[in-house]
Amino acid sequence: MKLDNLSPIKKGKVRDLYQLGENILIVSSDRISAFDVNSVTEIDGKGRSLNSLSAWWFKKTGNVFPNHFLEVLNSSKMLVKKAERIDVEWVMRGYLYGSMHRDYAKGNRELYGYKLPNGLNLAEKLPEVMLTPTTKADVGHDMPLTKKQAIDSRLVTQEEWRILEEASFKLYA
C-alpha cells in the first residue's frame, strides 16, 4: 500500500496515523524513542517487528479487553477501528525497575499512591503488583499520575478509571 497521496493525521514518536475511510492506518516506523528521547538514528526492521509484536498482543488479549485492532495489512502497517485515545499509559509493575527504581533510589517511598518499604533492591519483587500510570506525552517526558490526578485533570472519568484499572490487572495476571 502506497502512502503517496495521504498525509498523516498524527505523527507519533514511532508510529504515524492516517485516515483510511472510517478506519485508521497505523504505520510503524524504524524510528527510535527510548526513555522519552527520540533518536536521529533508525533501526532497519524495527517497524516490522513493532507492528508484528503489537498485532500478536492485540489478538492475544482481545478476549480480556476489547481493542481497536482489525488486521495487519503488511509488515509495517495495520488497520484499526477509529477510537478515542486515552492519554494515560497504564504501566503495571511487579518488580522494582526503571523509573520507579530511580525514584526509589532517591529516597522516595510513596510512588503512584503506593507506600513502599525501605530496603528494596533493583529488580526485587514488589510487595504487590502495582498500577503506575503516567501521562501519555506526545513530546517530552511522560509524568507519573495518581488516580486522583487523572480524574481531576479529566484524562479519564471515575468509571473509565475503574474499568481500565480492572482490565490492567487482568492483563498483567
Report each predicted region and the residues it spans.
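A short mid-domain helix/strand-loop element embedded in enzyme catalytic domains
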Residues: 126-156
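Active-site loop/lid in soluble adenylation, ligation, and acyl-transfer enzymes
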Residues: 1-136
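A long amphipathic alpha-helix within ATP-dependent nucleotide-binding catalytic cores
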Residues: 153-173
